[in-house]
A protein has these predicted regions:
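Amphipathic alpha-helical segments of tetratricopeptide repeats
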Residues: 19-29, 62-76, 107-116, 146-154, ...
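Residue signature of alpha-solenoid helical repeat architecture, marking inter-repeat boundaries
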Residues: 32-35, 77-84, 119, 161
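Hydrophobic positions within repeat-based interaction scaffolds
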Residues: 12-15, 55-58, 72, 81-84, ...
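Helix-start (N-cap) detector for alpha-helical repeat units in TPR-like alpha-solenoids
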Residues: 87, 121-122
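Solenoidal tandem-repeat scaffolds enriched in leucines and small polar residues
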Residues: 5-14, 18-74, 85
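"A position-specific structural signal for the A-helix of alpha-solenoid helical repeats
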Residues: 7, 36, 42-43, 85, ...
């Protein structure tokens, strides 16, 4: 509900929903509710970042970090789940601090992100792409995108918005490196895939 309202630009309603839901879940010892609370912290943090409400996003991010620490103490919750939660959060915090031009703090959180196993998987590498792009580390952006594209190709899953998002990140990185030919080639691929998606949707 909160996410739908936010996407429909009913932002006051969206944040009210997030806050009420978080209050209901806060303090729960039930495993699913604890996991759900972490999810809602993450969703609200992302929306606050998109709305340039950076101080509030940081506050929510730190609350999520505390919640992940609580999840770590639950025996039924796997280490991999907790690792992934930390990985995603630390990549976001690195990006926020880079936006705020607090580069040393950003790098500290990037290193925390790299300390997690998830950060070295194709999926996890994509978490850091916004930070790497903002900090001008374009080669790493391209490397991370390449690995994720290979994963999607092996799954024969390239006709979707997620794949297009990865390609757009590559375009930005190549433009940042002034490699205009490579950027143009990927833009052609984006157009081809977009046409294929539109054709498929029409046929369905």
């Amino acid at each position: 509900m909160g996410e739908n309202n936010w996407r429909l630009s009913f932002k006051d309603k969206a944040y009210d929903y997030f806050n009420r839901t978080i209050e209901l879940l806060r303090g729960s010892k039930e495993m699913r509710e604890m996991m759900l609370l972490s999810y809602y912290y993450g969703a609200e943090m992302s929306f606050l970042m998109n709305d340039s409400r950076i101080d509030e996003a940081l506050k929510v991010g730190f609350e999520r970090e505390k919640q992940i620490k609580r999840l770590k103490e639950v025996p039924q919750i796997s280490e991999d789940y907790v690792d992934g939660q930390y990985s995603y959060l630390y990549a976001k915090l690195a990006y926020i601090y880079c936006m705020e031009k607090k580069y040393e703090k950003a790098e500290q959180y990037y290193q925390k992100y790299l300390s997690k196993k998830e950060s070295h998987t194709p999926d996890g590498k994509m978490y850091s792409v916004p930070y790497l792009a903002l900090s001008g580390q374009y080669e790493k952006v391209i490397d991370n995108c390449r690995g994720f594209k290979e994963l999607m190709r092996t799954q024969q899953d390239t006709l979707n918005e997620q794949y297009l998002t990865v390609l757009r990140q590559e375009v930005k990185a190549y433009l940042g490196m002034h490699k205009y030919k490579e950027a143009a080639e990927i833009r052609e691929t984006i157009l081809t895939i977009t046409d294929s998606i539109n054709t498929r949707d029409r046929n369905n």
